[in-house]
Amino acid sequence: MQLEIKVALNFIISYLYNKLPRRRADLFGEELERLLRKKYEGHWYPEKPLKGSGFRCVHIGEVVDPVVELAAKRSGLAVEDVRANVPEELSVWIDPFEVSYQIGEKGVVKVLYLGDSEASGTPELDKEIKSSFNPDAQVFVPIGSQDSSLSSSPSPSFGQSPSPTFIPRSAQPITFTTASFAATKFGSTKMKKGGGASGGVSVGGSGAGGQQPPPQQPRMARSPTKNLLKHKSLSLSMHSLNLIPANPAPQSQLSPNAKEFVYNGGGSPSLFFDGVEGPSTSTTAPFGSGGASTCNSSSFDVSQVFGGGANSLFLEKSPFVEGLSYNLNTMQYPNQPFQPVVLAN
C-alpha cells in the first residue's frame, strides 16, 4: 500500500511544483499521504485488487475529494489553487499492485504503476507520463515513508535509485591565483577599476590591473619670483643703500661671470628725499677696473632705472620696478654694506 500511495502522490505533486510554494506542496503531499493511509485501513484487499476501487479513488475537479480538501487546509494551501494547477477532472485510482489515472470524464485510463501480485517486480510507467513527468516530482519523499521498508522499494519515477532525497546544489568555490587576487578589491571578488603595478611600473592593457589611471600633470616648481611679484613695494633701507658709512666690505663671493654694477652713495644726495644731503664721500668700487677711486663714470645710476628723477621712484613705477621686491636685509651679506647689483646672464 505504501508504494502505491507514493506513486499516486508523486504524480499529483508533480503538477504543483514550480507553480505553488515548494514547501507548501511538500506539506500537502505529507498530509495527503497520512490521510490516505488512514482512509485505506480496512479497505485494502491484495487478494482482490478491484474490490473497493471506487472508494480508494482520489478525484480533483469540480468536486474535490474531502481528503484533498483536508490536506490542503492543513498545509496552508487553498483548494482552488490545487484544483487550478492540476488537469481538469483528474481521477487517480490507487489499487493493490496498480495505480492508474484519467483526465476528463471521457479520457483514456492510463496506468502509472503495475506490479506483479505473485512476485514483486519493477514498476512500469506509462510512456506518455514518463516523457511528461515533472522531474521535480522525483525528489518528493513523504516524511512518513522514510523507513527501511520504503527505502528498499523501487522508485516509480524513471526506475532510478529508490527513495531520492533533496540534495542542495553546492556552489562552485571561487579560486584565485596570487596575481588575480592582488588585482581584486579588498573584501570583494570584483576587479579594481584602474590600477598599476607598484614601484612605478604601469600594467599594460592585457594585464590584470585593468585600466590605467590618467597620467598626472607634472607639478610646477614654485619659482622665487612668485613671491617677489606679490609685494610691489621696495623694501630698501638706509643701511642697505650704504647711506650710512661702514667699514669696507671684503671681496664679494658672487660669480665672476656676473656683471656687477656698484651704486655710488654720494652720486645722488637727494635720491629719495628732497633737501636731504647725503654723504659726500665716495666709495670705491671693489670690482672696478684699474682701481678707480670713484664710480661716477662706470657705476650704474639707480635713479635712471627708476624713472630718472628724485621724486619719480615711487610715483612712476616701471615694469622692472613692479617686479622687484627684494628684501635687501635678508640677502647673503648681513654684515656688509649693500652694493646694488643687477645680474644678467
From Swiss-Prot:
- Region (Disordered) residue ranges read 144-170, 188-225
The protein here is known as Protein Tob2
Positions carrying Phosphoserine are 255
Gene Ontology terms: biological process: negative regulation of osteoclast differentiation; osteoclast differentiation; positive regulation of ossification; regulation of gene expression
For bias type Low complexity, the affected ranges are 144-164
- Tell me what organism the protein belongs to: Mus musculus
For this protein, the record's InterPro entries field holds: Anti_prolifrtn, BTG-like_sf, PAM2_motif, Tob1/2
UniProt key word Phosphoprotein: yes
Drop me one GO molecular function for this one.
Answer: nuclear vitamin D receptor binding
Q: In which tissues is it expressed?
A: Ubiquitous.
